[in-house]
Amino acid sequence: MSNEGYDVTVFESMPKAGGWLRYGIPEYRLPKDILDKEIELMCRNGMQVETNKKLGVDFTLSQLSEDYDAVCLAVGASQAVEMNYSGSDLDGCYLGVDYLKDYVTEQNYVTAKKLP
């Protein structure tokens, strides 16, 4: 849209822009420097990115409607859905979405050594 002359502001809830391209795809599959260059190109064309901004926490849909001529919500799949199966409650068993995000950000999850 910014290529067509529209002012575009993207509100990203995470510390860096990119959504699941950044937080859900491991570095070896999608190098983050390539993603950063793509985002930088979009910003050069006029797109603005505001990070650490959560809908319903930092702003409301009503506020967006008042402040902007048009609003497009592209809410990602940031919450994992639990699947109750035998063993899913064991220590070291993580939901995939949570594990991928943690791997890229905090790296708090403990993983076991490789089994023989």
Where are these regions (language model features)?
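Residues forming the flavin
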Residues: M1-P116
